[in-house]
UniProtKB/Swiss-Prot annotation:
Protein's name according to its UniProt entry: Acetate transporter protein patA
GO biological process, one term: patulin biosynthetic process
Entry-listed glycosylation sites: N20
Entry GO CC: endoplasmic reticulum membrane; plasma membrane
Source species of the chain: Aspergillus clavatus (strain ATCC 1007 / CBS 513.65 / DSM 816 / NCTC 3887 / NRRL 1 / QM 1276 / 107)
């Protein structure tokens, strides 16, 4: 029974949105100098964060693809402010308490994006009204906004590569979503409506894939905690550790 528990603990650590390799060596080096006091285990917020991300991304992506004619994204302002905005920011703080800087940065970054995107789309903030005489300027501004966030998510993707394939694919497809959506707004600003709609739908398709991958991670984490099995994530940590040693 103890062997099963050890295996489960190891698998659980590998599925978290964090790095463990960098801290293990420093802990080993300091073990002979000081004894670390026992730490009470803290629950992981990763499943909640992944669920919030999945809900926000899949619903928004369905609107971007205009499924059943749902092309107006303002319907998801609640998701932006609360589910994926406030929710992910709170998850990020819990990751910080657990000492997970990468998880804190990723969840916090997506949370801040959703809060900002919700404010842009909420009529109470008057963003659209400020550009009512120049809609092309609004489209250009939104294009720049999404393009810069796409750069941030690109860094998330690169940093996820030494973890596993699912996180890398999830973040990579979300980065493509930001880039294509930015291109869509730029096309709209240039009055290329057909190209703009096509790019928007393509962004929705990549966003939908990203959301499905997040749902996959949620299922993995839930089954890992509650049942006797989990889903493969395509661990890449051993490969990258071997590459580092061979440098």
């Amino acid at each position: 029974m103890s062997n099963v528990k050890t295996a489960m603990d190891t698998s659980n650590e590998e599925s978290q949105l964090s790095y463990n390799a960098s801290t293990s060596s420093s802990c080993a080096a300091g073990k002979e100098h000081a004894t670390t006091p026992p730490i009470t285990p803290i629950g992981s917020p990763t499943a909640l964060g992944m669920g919030a991300f999945a809900i926000a991304f899949t619903t928004l992506s369905m609107s971007l693809m205009e499924w059943r004619g749902a092309a107006i994204t303002n319907a998801y302002i609640g998701n932006c402010f609360f589910t994926a905005g406030l929710g992910l920011v709170l998850v990020a703080q819990w990751e910080l308490v657990r000492g997970n800087s990468y998880g804190h940065t990723v969840f916090g970054g997506f949370g801040l994006f959703n809060l900002a995107f919700g404010a842009i789309n909420a009529p109470a903030f008057g963003v659209a009204d400020a550009f009512k005489d120049d809609p092309a300027a609004l489209s250009n501004a939104l294009g720049y906004f999404l393009l810069v966030w796409g750069v941030f998510v690109l860094f998330f993707t690169i940093a996820a590569m030494p973890m596993n394939l699912v996180y890398t694919a999830m973040l990579g497809t979300s980065q493509i979503t930001y880039t294509l959506l930015a291109a869509s707004y730029f096309a709209m600003a240039d009055e290329k409506a057909t190209a703009g709609v096509g790019l928007k739908k393509a962004a929705g398709a990549f966003g939908f894939v990203s959301g499905l991958l997040a749902w996959y991670v949620v299922a993995h984490l839930m089954c890992q905690d509650a049942l006797f099995f989990s889903f493969p994530l395509g661990d890449t940590s051993r490969l990258y550790a071997r590459l580092r040693r061979n440098r």
